[in-house]
Curated annotation (Swiss-Prot):
Motif (Nuclear localization signal 1): 138-145
Gene giving rise to this polypeptide: NOC3
BP GO terms, sorted: DNA replication; ribosome biogenesis
Name of the featured protein: Nucleolar complex-associated protein 3
Record keyword Cytoplasm present: no
Composition bias, Acidic residues: 118-129, 159-168
Subunit annotation: Component of nucleolar complexes. Interacts with RBL and NOC2 in both the nucleolus and nucleoplasm.
Keywords per UniProt: Coiled coil, DNA replication, Nucleus, Ribosome biogenesis
Motif annotated as Nuclear localization signal 2, chain positions: 408-415
One Gene Ontology cellular component annotation held by this UniProt entry: nucleoplasm
Gene source species: Arabidopsis thaliana (Mouse-ear cress)
Length: 830
């Protein structure tokens, strides 16, 4: 108890002297003199902190009476500020408070509610507590109270937090569902709006032509599905409401003229339709460059060009379609190519004008991309149709001319007789002029050109087509070059090194009938150079240079040369010996997985089977080369080679001496007495001096058709006539025996027989074979396996010993180092 009492005793600080302002303080002369003399002693005065001294002095502990008086004064000031908002409490209910002066003070209450009163009391207490300076004990009590309140608050929190956590995901899910529902509703509303606008336009386009603007505004939506639906619906609307003629907007003079209401209505309809169609095309061209709308935009452009090729802005449509004719996207490329083919085959819709424009655009496209396009870009030319008898006059025109001449004679006779006929003549002239004007207007609307105009357009298209073909040939010759070593190796393009050469050669073979004979010589020289481009090049340079022509492309060049000669009825004086030499060398360079067998079979048919006049030495060389070729490759290649070999032997009777082994071929060899298998020229091979020994091997082929064909060829006699030619061509043989159509299954010689038949059919050698002792056989196998196991174990032990021997010196070195580190003497010696 004594200790507690001692702690409760508080020693008040001494009273401070009265505050005096610095201005009122007076200093004597002696004080100033003393300070000047002893400045060192007066320096501490400058370092005194008056604020800290005042704080320490003001931090004395207040008594209970002082606190009470201070609180009462503050409450009094608050009551005075509130004014008349308080009422006096009954003195019976509440005891008064007596101050030191002896005055009684009764309690008053405000007119507010109890909650407001509690809030004000708490606020007042907080203000008072903040203003008072607390002791350490009071601070501790306050901290303890705050901790207790915090603990109570923590106990109450978890339930509320769990409720909030449960409520938040539900709210988020509900918000997401609402958003999805709103998005679906907006999507359905927009779809219905598009359908309504489209139905209005289709039902009455003249009255509802303004709704096209609303449909075009829907194309600006952020939803891609809505934009696609709007584009497709606009496509259907434009296909239906576009007229069958080209719209011509009125000029300034025509606008100044007075017109009827119907004409105004049609003009307004046509102008709004043209504006909407133009803006629609602009949107399609913009969407075409975006990957999301690429296919939809190209589909709309292609369908519009097919449906309304006569309408306005067809040039813009054609440019957009030709631009994507070699697109890397296969769907877009097929759409554009099919549209161009449709335009070429249906010239009645546009009068042939779009064909000329399309061919020119394709030619410029090929030139701009340096002939590095997809083959489909040139294959569309195969759909063009050229009229051969376009310049010949019709019978009706001749009949009309004769009728006009007779009429002229009659009119001249009548003029001399009657003067009144002059008036009739003037009327007839006026009628003829009017008819000519009407026919001219009709031509301008229907786009039906005359024979001269049509012939002119077709000559322009033909010149553009052959211009592209010759450009491709020159480009391939430039890339290959006269010496391939001069050209640096470079990677081929996305579509190959020469993607346009194959369709170019096919087009030349088809359209050479329309080509002038003056250009035939240049064409044959180009083909000859291309066919012999890789013949003088070594294998190393062929592998390094990827721009050399393949075997299939060189065979195509030979084929086109023969087709050009056939189409012109052999009117050209061109030697085809070089092409035979290339075919003779290309037969051995052929590889089935790399090259096309169809082209090889076609070249064998056209160059060897269909050729009427052949040299005996050359025919024998091809017979020998084809027999060697049949041994090296599959069924389809060997069958087509045997069919060609048979036709050559049937046509050339002297070449059948190759089938006779007794003759030896020496007497029929001619100038060359020995066969040269590595000769590049068939005329210098000396094939008549050899024998077809390959047929004896082919007669034992696993395929029965090839073996039978080889036996029939080997059994041919020299006395057989040439009338019994084979009905099967090399192309048919290759197609029938290719892997795709071949259904051949080699027969299994093992027959399913009964046990009795097996015993009876066994030969005597099989019966005399002794039975095998399985026990001895198993012992031998076990010994063999044990030997192998021992060998593996020995190898493993050897490897372990070697590793252990390598580790021993390392361990010794480590031990020596450790000893030296432990002994300090050894360190000094080191």
């Amino acid at each position: 108890m004594g200790k507690n009492r001692r702690k409760q005793k508080v020693i008040p600080p001494p009273l401070l002297p009265p505050d005096v302002a610095e201005e009122d303080i007076e200093f004597s002369d002696e004080d100033l003199k003393y300070v000047k003399e002893n400045t060192d002693y007066a320096q501490f005065v400058s370092q005194i902190d008056t604020a800290a001294i005042n704080k320490q002095c003001g931090g004395r502990v207040m008594t209970v009476e002082d606190k009470y008086e201070e609180e009462r004064s503050k409450r009094k000031t608050l009551q005075e500020e509130k004014g008349n908002g308080e009422i006096l409490v009954d003195p019976v209910d509440v005891l008064p408070v007596k101050t030191l002066d002896g005055k009684l003070h009764y309690r008053t209450e405000s007119k507010k509610s109890k909650l407001a009163e509690a809030e004000t009391d708490e606020a007042e207490k907080d203000v008072l507590e903040d203003e008072h300076v607390l002791n350490k004990s009071q601070r501790r009590e306050k901290a303890k109270k705050s901790k207790r309140e915090a603990k109570k608050h923590e106990k109450d929190l978890p339930d509320e937090i769990l409720q909030e956590e449960e409520e938040t995901p539900q709210a988020a899910v509900l918000a997401e569902v609402k958003e999805e529902l709103s998005a679906e509703e907006s999507f359905e509303n927009k779809k219905n709006k598009i359908a309504e606008l489209g139905m209005l336009l289709l039902s009455d386009p003249e009255a509802n032509i303004k709704t096209l603007k609303d449909m075009l505004d829907i194309c600006k939506d952020q939803n891609t599905k809505i934009v696609k639906l709007a584009l497709l619906s606009l496509l259907a609307v434009f296909k239906d409401i576009i007229p069958g003629y080209r719209i011509r907007l009125p000029t300034e003079k025509e606008l100044e003229m007075k017109i009827s209401k119907e004409v105004k209505k049609t003009r307004f309809y046509e102008s709004t339709l043209l504006k909407a169609y133009k803006s629609y095309l602009q949107k399609l061209i913009i969407f075409e460059k975006q990957s999301v709308y690429n296919q939809i935009a190209n589909r709309c452009l292609c369908t519009l060009l097919e449906a309304v090729p006569h309408f306005n802005y067809r040039d813009n449509l054609l440019i957009a379609v030709v631009r994507n004719i070699s697109s890397p996207d296969e769907v877009v490329r097929r759409l554009c190519c099919s549209t161009i083919r449709y335009l070429f085959s249906n010239e009645g819709k546009h009068g042939g004008e779009l064909t000329v424009q399309a061919v020119r655009l394709i030619a410029d496209h090929v030139k701009a991309h340096n002939c590095q396009l997809h083959p489909n870009a040139i294959e569309v030319f195969m759909s063009i149709r050229f009229d051969e008898d376009i310049g010949k006059p019709n019978k009706e025109d001749e009949h009309n001319k004769k009728y006009k001449k007779n009429n002229k004679r009659k009119t001249q006779e009548e003029q001399n007789q009657v003067q009144e006929n002059e008036r009739k003549k003037s009327k007839k002239d006026m009628m003829s002029k009017i008819r000519d004007e009407v026919s001219a207007d009709h031509r301008g609307v229907t786009y039906e050109p005359d024979a001269k105009e049509r012939r002119k357009m077709q000559t322009e298209t033909l010149s553009a087509v052959f211009e592209t073909y010759f450009r491709i040939l020159r480009n391939t010759m430039y890339t290959i070059g006269e010496r391939t070593e001069e050209i640096p190796t470079s990677n081929p393009g996305a579509f190959g090194s020469h993607p346009l050469l194959a369709p170019c050669l096919d087009g030349l073979a088809k359209f050479t009938q329309q080509l002038d004979l003056d250009y035939m010589g240049d064409l044959m020289n180009y083909l000859k150079k291309l066919a012999s481009s890789s013949s003088s090049v070594s294998n190393n340079t062929k592998q390094k240079n990827s721009k050399l022509l393949t075997v299939s492309e060189r065979l195509r060049c030979c084929l086109v040369a023969f087709k050009v000669m056939r189409s012109n009825l052999n009117a050209l004086n061109v030697d085809l010996q070089d092409f035979f030499v290339q075919l003779y060398n290309l037969i051995l360079e052929y590889r089935p997985g790399r090259d096309s067998g169809v082209i090889l079979a076609e070249s064998l048919k056209i160059m060897l089977c269909d050729d009427r006049h052949q040299d005996m030495q050359k025919a024998a060389a091809f017979v020998k080369r084809l027999a060697t070729f049949a041994l090296c490759f599959g069924c389809a290649e060997s069958m087509s080679a045997l069919v060609t070999l048979k036709t050559l032997l049937q046509k050339n009777v002297k070449c059948r001496n190759l089938l006779e082994n007794d003759a030896g071929g020496g007497s029929v060899s001619g100038s060359i007495a020995k066969y040269q298998p590595y000769a590049t020229d068939p005329n210098l091979s000396g094939a008549l001096a050899t024998v077809l020994w390959e047929l004896s091997l082919l007669s034992k082929h696993y395929h029965p058709a090839i073996s039978t064909m080889a036996t029939t060829v080997s059994n041919m006699n020299t006395s057989q006539s040439q009338t019994f030619l084979s009905a099967v061509t090399p192309q048919q043989a290759f197609a029938d025996f290719s892997l795709v159509k071949e259904s051949f299954e080699p027969k299994n010689e093992s027959r399913k027989l009964n046990n009795k038949r097996k015993r009876e059919s066994l030969p005597e050698e099989a019966k005399n074979v002794p039975e095998i002792d399985m026990v001895k056989l198993s012992k031998k196998l076990k010994e063999n396996f044990t030997i192998l196991r021992d060998i593996k174990e020995d190898e493993r032990v050897r490897m372990e010993l070697l590793q252990s021997e390598e580790k021993k010196p390392l361990k010794k070195q480590n031990n020596v180092v450790k000893k030296k580190l432990k002994n300090p003497k050894s360190k000094k010696q080191i």
